[in-house]
A protein has these predicted regions:
Chain A
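Alpha-helical transmembrane segments of multi-pass membrane proteins predominantly involved
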Residues: 1-179
Length: 179, 160
């Protein structure tokens, strides 16, 4: 299946933003490029039929993370060097190139999007969730059923991680109040 | 701030008062928090859930902080409120899990509540989503306030 024109535009946009975030010398510009990248990715998630993930990406990646980055930048001093782009080190470039090469080699082995024979679809657990999640949990969004019911313990762990983040910030900042 | 004057560098100024931003935020804030609560409540039947909804609710407070300054936002949302919301969320989640054990099931086995209330599983999942949302919203706001204030020895104790 060939990608829709909008998907191609989005992919190019995301790629350009990612390169921009990595190469732009100005931290503020890099943060904005990163936010745009995150927003593009969140729309791509919707194209990939994963609206739950897309919503998270848009809220956390493009929204809150950008604000926290901006705050951090506002709190720190940076010296304008006058250049637009960061100078690229050859070693980093070789490393990134090798990583992209490995990914490109693996990519053909990934099943096509929506392929009914894809292992993730034919796997017993997936079929079980799709067949029984409404009966057993009473919620129609299977993602929520897996998240809150079948994998509830994992989600409790996730919520604890978020809670711990606030505690960790208090410890690092040597404070007793969040505000 | 040490160079509090008119020659403040643009990157040092964390807060710029703007009537447009304040009016816009005042207008859209109720809609943002409503949408956040919708995403939290409706996560069982549509995309969304506690994590996403919590971030959106937290973003509402962050928006107010951006528009009106961090100090007024701090006055508005007290530390006690944030801590209470986050811990209530965490304790609710654990209580739902332990309650199932008290009723003879396993930890977080919603089905064991079924004799008490029909469709218990669905409502408990909603409750758990709300608990997650409470944790996430409070932590997002807390991270924002903490980052805005900085380290205890920082020279920029209160900027806004």
């Amino acid at each position: 299946m060939s990608p829709a024109p909008l998907e191609v535009v989005l992919l190019v946009f995301v790629l350009a933003c990612a390169v921009g975030a990595a190469l732009l010398e100005d931290v503020l510009a890099a943060i904005l490029a990163f936010a745009a990248y995150s927003l593009g990715i969140s729309v791509l998630w919707v194209f990939l039929q994963a609206p739950d993930v897309g919503l998270t990406e848009a809220a956390v990646g493009a929204g809150i993370m950008t604000i926290l980055f901006l705050l951090a930048v506002a709190k720190t001093a940076r010296e304008p060097s006058g250049r637009t782009l960061e100078s690229v080190r050859w070693r980093s470039l070789v490393l990134v190139g090798a990583f992209v090469g490995v990914l490109a080699l693996v990519l053909p082995a990934v099943p096509a999007i929506g392929d009914p024979a894809a292992p993730v679809l034919s796997y017993d657990v997936t079929q079980y969730y799709l067949a029984n999640s409404y009966e057993e949990t009473g919620v129609t969004n299977a993602v929520t059923a897996v998240l809150a019911a079948y994998r509830g313990l994992d989600t409790l762990g996730e919520a604890t991680v978020v809670f711990t983040a606030a505690v960790a910030v208090l410890v690092v900042f040597d404070r007793e109040v969040l505000t | 701030m040490s160079d509090a004057g008119q020659s403040r560098p643009p990157e040092g100024a964390a807060y710029v008062e703007s009537t447009i931003i304040m009016t816009t935020v005042r207008l859209i804030a109720p809609f943002v928090i409503t949408y956040g609560l919708f995403v939290m409540f409706h996560g069982a039947d549509s995309p969304g859930g506690g994590f996403q909804g919590g971030v959106i609710v937290g973003a509402m407070v962050v928006m107010v902080g951006f528009a009106f300054g961090v100090a007024p936002a701090r006055e508005w949302v007290k530390n006690d409120v944030l801590v209470a919301v986050a811990t209530t969320g965490a304790l609710t989640f654990v209580a739902v899990g332990l309650g199932a054990q008290l009723l003879g099931g396993r930890f977080l086995e919603y089905a064991s509540y079924e004799p008490l209330y029909h469709h218990a599983s669905k409502y408990l999942i909603e409750l758990v989503e709300l608990a997650i949302g409470a944790i996430v919203a409070a932590v997002v706001v807390g991270l924002y306030f903490s980052l805005a204030r900085g380290h205890v020895g920082s020279t920029e104790e209160d900027e806004a």
